Regions:
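Peripheral interaction segments used for macromolecular assembly
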Residues: 1-190
Length: 190
């Protein structure tokens, strides 16, 4: 893996701490804007251990096991041991997940197809690039050694990496090849 790159899986379940350095939960997912070039993280899904408030709203009773989507502007720092938020619990700004692309939910392990609907393979890993506190989508990692179609996939990935002038790992499809993410499949430009 190239310097500055990391896998989505390495961030999932990472501890999340508020502005007072209290553990409030863990990272559950990341929302990305695929229209941006390169695609950038827009929101962070945090699995809270418990809360009696959502933003400024007081709940009728405390709840456990709730996932809130917070805008990326809430992220103060990304450290190896934790994600640090700008505000203290429970004073977070909250976003709706409606219309958002969440990498864990919508991309990881999703079936990839070409524009004609031919099945290619599943997404094995999502590769991100970190620049300061920002995260960008680099590409989609695919395994090529376990499947009979491995050589065909290897040729396809090589072709895509040359098309988008991307050096690096031979088994990573560049983000530029992603056409769209549908409910049932991720469409790749071949």
């Amino acid at each position: 893996m190239e310097e500055g790159q990391l896998m989505l899986a390495s961030l999932l379940r990472r501890e999340v701490r508020d502005a007072k350095d209290r553990e409030v939960g863990h990272l559950e997912d990341l929302a990305f804007d695929l229209a941006a070039r390169p695609p950038v993280a827009t929101d962070i899904a945090v699995h809270l251990e418990w809360t009696d408030r959502v933003g400024e709203l007081l709940l009728p009773r405390p709840v456990e096991d709730i996932v809130l989507l917070l805008p990326w502007s809430e992220v103060e720092a990304l450290e190896p041991e934790a994600v640090y938020l700008r505000h203290e619990h429970p004073r977070f700004e909250v976003s709706s997940s409606e219309g958002k692309l969440l990498l864990r939910r919508d991309v990881l392990n999703k079936q990839m197809v070409d524009a004609e609907g031919n099945r290619l393979q599943r997404v094995d890993a999502v590769i991100l690039k970190r620049e300061g506190v920002l995260l960008f989508l680099e590409g989609l990692q695919v395994g090529m050694e376990w499947f009979p179609a491995g050589k065909r996939m290897e040729r396809l990935v090589g072709k895509l990496r040359r098309r988008y002038n991307r050096a690096g790992e031979a088994n990573v499809i560049p983000y530029e090849a992603i056409v769209r993410v549908d409910e049932e499949a991720l469409v790749i430009r071949t």
